[in-house]
């Protein structure tokens, strides 16, 4: 790429040699045109700020435009260019026009107040000054003009878009912006008053280039951080959506439950009010609705309390008296700071007083006094007695409800009025909160009223279903009962079986210990003793009739302990055990493929891990590792535009460094590898597979299949099917002529 200087800008072109020569001619012609323009301008004349000066300026602009046109014409006539060349030359033309405009602007800026104009001299290639027409020294640039140019450049760069971009990056960006402005200020101070605009501009460009490179690098880093954060957030999107789905479903269930509860309570309160107030039901409901809103209580609770209180107090106080008493008592309780629960207890105490007909210390000092401070003094002031006199009246049974309660109602009304009345009650925070709760309860009741028909139909359908399935339920109960009976019989049978096994074991031990050392040494290698031991095995099989039980006992090491304590090694006893079993009167059996043959039985009995393989029932979560690997934020996943699950190609270590993931496995292979390992471990430990017996007496293993489906974000991402086989405990069928007990 050749570089050619044209005036004060650099153009990089990749043309052929012919194009380069043409550009050289263009450069020469441009310089000649510029020199002609400068010679015309540098003529010594005075320009007045009038019509003639404007005409002179117009001529300058016209000459510059004419020069630009000649440049374009010379280029087009010198050679033919392709589209790229035309674009480059158009750019060159644009720069020439820009130069002409700059000349015009410089002329306007250089005009003095008295109309004098000082023109800047041009510079040729290599920085050589072009002498003005008429001789004399070259004219230098005025310092004040250069200073104004530097000031404009300084202000533009100081508040440029670059500094604003730096300030949006963050803490480091703000520091970089401050550093940039400080460096810019230092450069300006260094060149201030020197008139070296070109050098100043180059220094500023260097500073801007360095700052821009930092901005580009920082933007790349921030983009990487955002992408990593997005991928990590997307990796756990399925779990959050799953939890969110459960929360939404639970919230909907809770809303349905609360709706039904609120609706049923409202229906119950309405029904009770009808039964208690009779013809005055509508008036009572209107009072309850209005008063509940005033004191910030739920309408259902107010209606229920009012109805219950009226049931006991209405015969004594009448409808109007009951309403006034309830109103005064509720407002008085609110002023004394009673909560909704306290208000319920207070009204229950007043109800009991009214229904019993007498005021007793149990209600006044206990139930009412615990919830309403100053209750005793309230009653004493109402009837004009002292607390001691009040106690005596209650003790004598002379404090009647029909005489006392109306006076208490009047006293409570006086105290409420002194405290500010209903206005004071409505301004309490508890009242506002209660009103909000009441509106929510009304909303739930509205939901219930619109859905009550559907709820009733569903409830009836459920009841009919349960009634219709009663026979099936009874049959299921019989099945469960039979299973439990079988389990009980099995435990009883196992107990008897253990007694028999223990007897055979101790019999063999006692018989062996009665022998002397030489006889014991002979017996160790004899098939007779082995036959006795295997006879025990045959007896066990005949008695138990349970293959799993025999396998468990073998795994538990009962026969292994017999051989170990008798000093008989398990190695090399397979064939001897089979022969000894036949010699001992035990028919050799066909063993199922697996670990429970006659020889493998002995070997498994001496294996310390045999019992563990059989008896381990505390299995780990079989898919915990697979799920943890899939949802690991170190291994983020996402769905591509085709809806396929993909792994991110990069991960992040504990230090925050990005690493490329490339282990040679595809995404599905990684999932299946982890999933298969977990499922295989689960299948290996799930070794108690049920067996079926054919009519010929041979064991036939039933197949069990474990189907596992993984869903992520509502999409099925993997399906795994595993056949669970019993690799450790296979059923055996032993046939033995075990003598029955006499």
Swiss-Prot record:
Determine the domain of life of the protein's source. Viruses
Which terms are listed as keywords in the entry? Answer: Coiled coil, Viral release from host cell, Viral tail assembly
One GO term under biological process is: viral tail assembly
Presence of the UniProt keyword Thylakoid in the record = no
- Show the segment(s) annotated as Disordered: 120-140
Family to which the UniProt record says this protein belongs: Belongs to the Mulikevirus tape measure protein family.
Q: What does this protein do?
A: Serves as a base for tail tube protein polymerization and acts as a template for tail length determination.
Cross-referenced NCBIfam families: tape_meas_nterm
**Protein name, UniProt field:** Probable tape measure protein
